[in-house]
Curated annotation (Swiss-Prot):
Pathway: Protein modification; lipoprotein biosynthesis (diacylglyceryl transfer). Catalyzes the transfer of the diacylglyceryl group from phosphatidylglycerol to the sulfhydryl group of the N-terminal cysteine of a prolipoprotein, the first step in the formation of mature lipoproteins. One of its GO terms (biological process) is lipoprotein biosynthetic process. GO terms for molecular function: phosphatidylglycerol-prolipoprotein diacylglyceryl transferase activity. It comes from Streptococcus sanguinis (strain SK36). It is a multi-pass membrane protein. This is Phosphatidylglycerol--prolipoprotein diacylglyceryl transferase.
């Protein structure tokens, strides 16, 4: 199996998880800065936003994870900030998205940027970053699904790493990574089509696409908190889908400008 630690520098462990997150972030920032001028947004605003939003999102993702694992962390408070022993592995993407959205609201108000324009730029970048970041779960041997008889359709390096606790496991990380990659490609193609998508609909596409995929894939997992018959992440996914649909209906009704004239 793959060692979750990529580099050991004395007492400091640099995990593949962190490398995947940073790689996804760098690519996301590059793509967003390249697209920003098309929406009359200064590329430096993208960088300034990331410098604030990224650490806040990490904290939000960590707090979200801790909140739903409080039975453990309530008895081991020091583990909440125990990043030097792999604490960064315990984060949840929805917590990061919520924290990032809060930062986005205040950032756009301060810089006098239309939040919808910023979201349209950010959506494909977030999607590709998530696609790459999921491979960190693979290296950590986490976020996997239920036991299956075999995974013969997968390459051996994935199959071997999905043999956990005496059984092969559904590689849900891979399903979500591929799903996000497909969504990213679709957004890049569709946003170049003239008079197809209206302002805000790229962000709406992300919410619907990611929400739908996450809701299905989350049902394959065995390590998620349940609430009222569904996993918490599935409820949040449903919210994303309905918000995305609502944005499209609203933007079409008010005849918002096209993203690409």
């Amino acid at each position: 199996m793959i060692d979750p630690v990529a580099i050991q520098l004395g007492p400091i462990s640099i995990r593949w998880y962190a490398i995947c997150i940073v790689t996804g972030l760098v690519l996301a920032v590059y793509l967003a800065m390249k697209e920003a001028p098309r929406r009359k947004i200064i590329p430096d605003d993208i960088l300034d936003f990331i410098l604030v939003a990224f650490p806040v999102a990490i904290v939000g993702a960590r707090l979200y994870y801790v909140a739903f694992e409080w039975d453990y962390y309530g008895k081991n408070l020091i583990k909440i900030i125990d990043f030097w022993n792999g604490g960064i592995a315990g984060i949840a993407i929805y917590g990061g998205l919520i924290a990032g959205a809060i930062v986005l609201y205040f950032f756009c108000r301060r810089r006098l940027i239309h939040p919808v324009d910023f979201l349209d730029i950010a959506a494909p970048s977030v999607m590709i970053a998530q696609s790459i970041g999921r491979w960190g779960n693979f290296a950590n041997h986490e976020a996997y699904g239920a036991a299956v008889k075999s995974l013969d359709y997968l390459p051996s390096f994935i199959r071997e790493n999905m043999y956990i606790e005496g059984s092969y496991r559904q590689p849900t990380f891979l399903y979500e990574s591929v799903w996000n990659l497909i969504g990213f490609i679709l957004i890049i193609v569709l946003r170049r089509r003239p008079k197809l998508l209206r302002q805000g609909e790229i962000a709406a596409f992300y919410l619907i696409w990611y929400g739908f995929g996450r809701m299905i894939i989350e049902g394959m997992r065995t390590d998620s908190l349940m609430f009222a018959g569904l996993r918490v992440s599935q409820w949040l996914s449903l919210i994303l889908i309905f918000v995305g649909i609502g944005i499209i209906i609203y933007q079409r009704k008010k005849k918002a400008p096209y993203y690409q004239e």
